[in-house]
Amino acid sequence: MVNIPKTRNTYCKGKECRKHTQHKVTQYKAGKASLYAQGKRRYDRKQSGYGGQTKQIFHKKAKTTKKVVLRLECVKCKVKMQLALKRCKHFELGGDKKQKGQALQF
């Protein structure tokens, strides 16, 4: 299990800062896919009408986890950057710290 604190002191690339400052940490989440992207428009046009499924649907999934991406926002200048972590099954943001002799809880 990976437990990350909600704030982190790290280097800020913003023009005002360019030094180590406090950053607010959140987990990156993919945005909603646009209906007007060229690939989606082409796919919808091809799918319309008779003839069933026209493109292959991918089934051979190989990975069991995704890489965790952190979104760091500078508290002073509000510049945002992303930081990729390694793959993990359990990810927690701002959870309780581990204590010695305690059982793991999911």
Curated annotation (Swiss-Prot):
Coiled coil region boundaries: none
Biological process per Gene Ontology, one example term: translation
Keywords: Ribonucleoprotein, Ribosomal protein
GO MF annotation list: structural constituent of ribosome
SUPFAM superfamilies listed in its UniProt record: Zn-binding ribosomal proteins
PROSITE patterns, A to Z: RIBOSOMAL_L44E (PS01172)
Name the record gives this protein: Large ribosomal subunit protein eL42
Organism annotation: Yarrowia lipolytica (strain CLIB 122 / E 150)
